[in-house]
Amino acid sequence: MLNRCLGAAISSSADLLRAIAFAADKHRDQRRKDAEASPYVNHVIAVAELLARVGEITDQTVLVAAILHDTVEDTETTAQELADHFGTAVARIVAEVTDDKALPKEERKLLQVEHARDASPAAKLVKLGDKIVNVVDVTNQPPPTWSVERRLEYLAWAERVIAGCRGTNAALERMFDEVVVRGREKILQEAGAA
């Protein structure tokens, strides 16, 4: 029995590490928009870590999808490639949270709001984690070119997206609400001091 439990844990850890290695390779030339131009892979790891720590998510499919959530949207990775390497369940979740980059940005943002309410519970979890991490980054390490107005608009848009994810995970939803309130306060404070 113990060997079976250890084997499952090792397999789960191996799957997560394999996903991190895959994401690190796919995002290797990408950087975040912050002033430090931090490695993009830090973002996807932060999303998965947040889901596990705050949301107490243990479903490996969700955590692997969180790590891979931007690979199809932001790299040359295909949904079929994800399915081949990580299974169709992971590929489906990633597909649900992937924007169609062929569409104009404003249309993509509107579609995120519309699609959130109909997303699977797993996709809603990934979306919650992604938006929490992004709101924290926009608050504390914004892209240098973003104005106060643009930062506040991002927070308001994120709230509209997450409205469709409500009822999925109370701890993550609470954290989202907290980071938005703190973010708005900090951004407005910084604007007043400028």
Predicted regions and their residues:
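Active-site helical microenvironments for divalent-metal-assisted chemistry
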Residues: M1-A194
